[in-house]
Amino acid sequence: MASPAPAFSLANLLNGSYGVDTPEDVERLRSEQREEAAAACRNYRPLPAVDVSESVTEDAHSLRTPDGAPAEAVSDEFVTYGAEDYLEKSDDELLVAFETMVKPMRIGQLWCPAFNKCSFISSIAMARALLLAPRTSNRTMKCFEDLVAAIYTKSDFYYGEECEADDVQMDISSRDVPGYSFEPWSRTSGFEPPPICEACDMIMYQCPCFDFNALKKSCAERTFADDYVIEGLDGVVDNATLLSNLGPFLVPVKCQYENCPTPTLAIPPDLNRATDRVDINLVQSICDSTLPTHSNYDDSFHQVFVESADYSIDLDHVRLRQSDLIAKIPDSGHMIPVLNTGSGHKRVGTTKEVLTAIKKRNADVPELGDSVNLSRLSKAVAERFFISYINGNSLASSNFVNVVSNFHDYMEKWKSSGLSYDDLPDLHAENLQFYDHMIKSDVKPVVSDTLNIDRPVPATITYHKKSITSQFSPLFTALFERFQRCLRERIILPVGKISSLEMAGFDVKNKHCLEIDLSKFDKSQGEFHLLIQEHILNGLGCPAPITKWWCDFHRFSYIRDRRAGVGMPISFQRRTGDAFTYFGNTIVTMAEFAWCYDTDQFEKLLFSGDDSLGFSLLPPVGDPSKFTTLFNMEAKVMEPAVPYICSKFLLSDEFGNTFSVPDPLREVQRLGTKKIPYSDNDEFLFAHFMSFVDRLKFLDRMSQSCIDQLSIFFELKYKKSGEEAALMLGAFKKYTANFQSYKELYYSDRRQCELINSFCSTEFRVERVNSNKQRKKYGIERRCNDKRRTPTGSYGGGEEAETKISQAESTGTRSQKSQRESAFKSQTVPLPTVLSSRWFGTDRVEPPCERGGVTRA
């Protein structure tokens, strides 16, 4: 009789008597389980009397659940032996059971999966519970041993659809290997019949003609593939392929090779060059995705809308003179780009267009600065400038050079424009406060997505005549060269022959960048900036009278646009076209930067006009608010900062050298420019092509590392995909290769009449009929056969100058005429008459004048 279970108490809990099953309890639980199993069998299928002491058959697949679904077999293993029985077994017995149920893979002395006693017994208990639980799924659950293995390895408890419970061998043919099919091969006993010699009918091993050394050598060269039968194999299969296909079971298979489908290649094999993948449609798609508002932009009639619509503007002290406007000189037309990149047409300097440009570029000067002591603070800023940038020893040992030679170079440069030494005026007799004004006909490319809501305004140029500029430019050019020689080593001005953006031994990677964007830079400069540059010019060695004189006629000036009839006074703002524009903007930017930031924290500093860029190992520390409160500038610190200056990215190659790369976004916009004049021999288009090649000479240095840098910097600056920048480089490489590729980007809207003769050339006759129609020119009646020239004087009533044709000229003319006639008669092949209906330039490779049999009408 079973003893009652011990009561719960602290003593029974500590001595281990509470919670431990006695042998009687174990026997009682087993009896109850046997009764439950027998009752289930009696309820769902009539069974003969079964002795509960006997084990239920292992393969009892005929049990049925109440809903008619087949149930799993009630195995003797989980009825007779529970988790408690395995706890009583020794470690060796558990290892045998683990190897029988889980079937681990042996790798040397290791098992995979590794044996864990607790996990193994827990898996047995869970498998026992799952088999007794009611079935809720139509899938076939694994048998007890496989279920224990599935729980232990954390795999599926059910058999797959292609596998049955009694067949768990892997179907090798079901593997998806392209081009190969595998079928199971029957195992062989490994016995090989000995080879029989045909000559002596003896076993080759005993035959005197048997070469044992050759057989030994051949057996030594046997590989894994020689141990398996491979039939119908047309391709080449190596050992690695066989191992991956056979798997860990190493079952002999029959391998059969089939033809693989033709692979789909993103790049056709015949396109072996990177530029072959680039066409005009790809470049246009890049523009559409990168510049979404530019692809549909067309400003062909924007200026017409401005001129014909009502116009309202608020300006002070403006003088309009509409009586002597200069009419627009008609040009010969411009080439039309194939790409639509948002480039605008050339702006005409009409009155409304000039007033709009003056309103934005010259008028409405911002007043953001505080009230300061100009004389004292300007000297302090100039002193900080020399301490931060100038090498005192170099400045003391340097002097002016090449002033006269610079003057002669300037005169030679503009000699073709009519500038001569005799035309140079006396500067003391000239009013230097008067400046000419004009607008730039070319609008700067817009990189922001605002063309759908904002019309770009052209920039303005305020300039002196060349005769005045020629006398100041040589002096400031020599002074700027001296200024470059006196700079510290870490200061770089990317201009001229002395310095550029090429920096050897300097890597821009792993550096902190600082880029300050100064808006409205020219018109925001006031008297404070004029005093600063006056002190700096005196410190650099410019003669004090010239400095004083130069600054005096920049305090108050008057600008006038003769073509538009507009004039207005201006004060201290920068003149955008005089001899000191770039030099003055550069030293003002450097002075402001030195006052707002400590320049000693930077490894490299680059300045060019109103652009600035600094590199440092640590994050830069400074007060950029002084740009606004002290220097009256609208300043913005670019975040995230990238190495970008003068519309160029700075990249470093594998050798640690830095070079500049033009902004791909601006360059791809220039491919759609609308300012190239038309010419019959494409001379203007070729000039633009050479300029394009010169700007993109960096392409030969672009390695994959540099392309990755450019993609990252492009994404950080424009928040656009860096892959587009890499595609732009491929387009640049194609269109810089030769001029014929570049000509695909433009065409002309001039309709050319191409007349091709359809009759024999020997029947062609040209007859000139003397016309009685009279022509009048400068008041003189002339007939078409009159050999007299028009008057050479400036007035229409001048005397006629008779023209005598020399005998040599007439002889040369007759010889040229005979040569043309003989060349024309040599063409005996009749050609059909074709009138071209397409625009000239869209599909041409060479001009019509170079095609045979084409005559322009």
UniProtKB/Swiss-Prot annotation:
It is an enzyme of class 2 (transferase). It holds the Pfam family RdRP_2. The keyword Transferase applies. SUPFAM superfamilies: DNA/RNA polymerases. GO terms for biological process: DNA-templated transcription; positive stranded viral RNA replication. GO terms for molecular function: nucleotide binding; RNA binding; RNA-directed RNA polymerase activity. The keyword Nucleotidyltransferase applies. It comes from the Viruses. Residues 511-624 form the RdRp catalytic domain. It catalyses: RNA(n) + a ribonucleoside 5'-triphosphate = RNA(n+1) + diphosphate. Keywords: Nucleotide-binding, Nucleotidyltransferase, RNA-directed RNA polymerase, Transferase, Viral RNA replication. Belongs to the ssRNA positive-strand viruses RNA-directed RNA polymerase family. This is RNA-directed RNA polymerase 2a.
